[in-house]
Amino acid sequence: MSLLLENLIEEDTIFFAGSISEYDDLQMVIAGAKSKFPRSMLSIFNIVPRTMSKYELELIHNENITGAMFTTMYNIRNNLGLGDDKLTIEAIENYFLDPNNEVMPLIINNTDMTTVIPKKSGRRKNKNMVIFRQGSSPILCIFETRKKINIYKENMESVSTEYTPIGDNKALISKYAGINILNVYSPSTSMRLNAIYGFTNKNKLEKLSTNKELESYSSSPLQEPIRLNDFLGLLECVKKNIPLTDIPTKD
């Protein structure tokens, strides 16, 4: 199993983010397969943000963006190669906003993960799979733009035979297997880390404002795993208490 996800999910892949029904859909996956982006919980859903499109981009908003990313402290430490060094708030921000990252996929207010289909494991199908394992230290990171940014959508009625780069300093609302994700391009130039939250053993969130609080949280990992139903409840709680960007889309 990939070390990126070793402490993030169970031993087997537990979610299936939808089959590729058409060759064009396969091309769309390929269009982003080599992009550089910070790994997060969205990796569970096989979400690879695209950096190219064959559709005309249509401007729909110009506004400030607030979005969320779920991951684990282990995931960040492993990707940064920190070894025994302490993970700091600055390191977390640098990981997500590394200038080498071409795109950052964000969860927004109208991101609905209830449509995700659990993958069968053997002959059994567990509808309440583990999202964050016992012993892990999951965190929720809230990002916001420094200033207003153009938000686009793809005009599916205006298609080209060739893919073109989406470009920098913009955001694109995209749908991956029924999940609305907001991709921010060249995030290091437009985004900043606003807040970090940890998960308590009562499936609640606590704000981690200092490196001391972050270190204390990492020394008290989850005593019980967070399963799908609990995670969906946490996500709804986040949406109610944190003003994430809402971008209505038509199915």
Swiss-Prot record:
Transmembrane segments: none annotated. GO terms for molecular function: structural molecule activity. Keywords: Host cytoplasm, Late protein, Virion. Major core structural protein. This is Core protein VP8. It is found in: Virion; Host cytoplasm. Residues 1-32 form a propeptide. GO terms for cellular component: host cell cytoplasm; viral capsid. Its main location: virion. InterPro entries: VP8_pox_nuc-bd. It comes from the Viruses. Belongs to the orthopoxvirus OPG098 family. It comes from Monkeypox virus. Pfam families: Pox_VP8_L4R (PF04498). Undergoes morphogenesis-associated proteolysis which cleaves the 28 kDa to a 25-kDa product. Proteolytic cleavage of major core proteins P4a (OPG136), P4b (OPG129), and VP8 (OPG098), which occurs at a late stage of core formation, is required for production of infectious mature virions (MV). The record marks 18-19, 32-33 as: Cleavage. The gene is OPG098.
